[in-house]
């Protein structure tokens, strides 16, 4: 049976960790599906990981649709989540709904992911009201890398931390069914996870999120040119073994450890957040 948004909400309620991996092809999707990974994210990170681009901004809808189709063919039980690429939803309500629906109709995805907070809440509402599950993404949002001044931790001071909390509440109220938190301090991610009713999925945001996500190529150590602080290599010899190790360490709370997380907020500042 296909995993569902309802099953992820139940996991949060039972304090059971959700496993997510970003992958881009039929073969890796089959491995992840066989390893009982909850969610396969067809991330726009494929622009850099697979297509060799400098950032995620240049990947197109047509390219994302092709890779999502491949993953959908390989995943029989895992929930397939498609990243909506840069400017496929920001420009207008019409674009947001039409492009989201293309992922469902043409690529057989089960939901879509968008980056941003209050500023895209209206689009999250429109897409979710059309019957398409929407996952939001806050913190380090790669599509806004030029605005953020590079790939760096977000929410390190009172003002920016409160902004992320406000955005998290806004996307939940708009109908988002889940929230990815990328590169935010551990204690901030913990606070957001406790405030929200929807599950949080962390990447570089500590062990207190309701689940974790890593890129398939990263957790297997296939990218020799780059290793972020939040990445752990599990096994590059046998992909199935590597994915199973990742799954088990997420579920048991071993991963991520302090080594793979960021913590810039002291308790005095944390007490001022609401």
Curated annotation (Swiss-Prot):
Residues of the active site are 182 (proton acceptor)
Annotated compartments: Cytoplasm
This enzyme's EC code(s): 2.1.2.11
A GO term from the CC aspect: cytoplasm
Q: Name one GO molecular function term.
A: magnesium ion binding
Amino acids binding Mg(2+): 44, 83, 115
Give the catalytic activity: 3-methyl-2-oxobutanoate + (6R)-5,10-methylene-5,6,7,8-tetrahydrofolate + H2O = 2-dehydropantoate + (6S)-5,6,7,8-tetrahydrofolate
State its role.
Answer: Catalyzes the reversible reaction in which hydroxymethyl group from 5,10-methylenetetrahydrofolate is transferred onto alpha-ketoisovalerate to form ketopantoate.
What is the protein name for this chain?
Answer: 3-methyl-2-oxobutanoate hydroxymethyltransferase
Instruction: Please give the organism.
Output: Campylobacter jejuni (strain RM1221)
């Amino acid at each position: 049976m296909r995993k569902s948004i309802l099953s992820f909400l139940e996991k949060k309620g039972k304090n059971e960790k959700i496993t997510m991996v970003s992958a881009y092809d039929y073969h890796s999707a089959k491995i992840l599906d066989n390893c009982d990974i909850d969610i396969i994210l067809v991330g726009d990170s494929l622009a850099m990981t697979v297509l060799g681009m400098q950032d995620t901004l240049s990947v197109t809808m047509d390219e994302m649709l092709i890779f999502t189709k491949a993953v959908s063919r390989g995943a029989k039980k895992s929930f397939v989540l498609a990243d909506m690429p840069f400017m496929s939803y920001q420009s207008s309500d019409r674009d947001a709904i039409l492009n989201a629906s293309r992922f469902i109709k043409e690529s057989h995805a089960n939901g879509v992911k968008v980056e941003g907070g209050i500023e895209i809440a209206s689009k999250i509402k429109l897409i979710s009201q059309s019957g398409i599950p929407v996952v939001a993404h806050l913190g380090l949002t790669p599509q806004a890398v030029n605005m953020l001044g590079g790939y760096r931790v977000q929410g390190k001071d009172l003002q920016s931390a409160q902004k992320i909390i406000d955005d998290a509440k806004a996307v939940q109220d708009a109908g988002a069914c889940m929230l990815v938190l990328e590169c935010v301090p551990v204690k901030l991610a913990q606070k957001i996870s406790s405030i929200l009713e929807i599950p949080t999925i962390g990447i570089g945001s500590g062990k207190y999120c309701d689940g974790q996500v890593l890129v398939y190529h990263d957790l297997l150590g296939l990218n020799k040119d780059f290793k972020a602080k939040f990445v752990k290599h599990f096994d590059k010899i046998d992909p199935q073994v590597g994915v199973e190790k990742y799954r088990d360490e997420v579920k048991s709370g071993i991963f991520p450890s302090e080594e793979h997380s960021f913590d810039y907020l002291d308790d005095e500042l944390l007490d001022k957040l609401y």
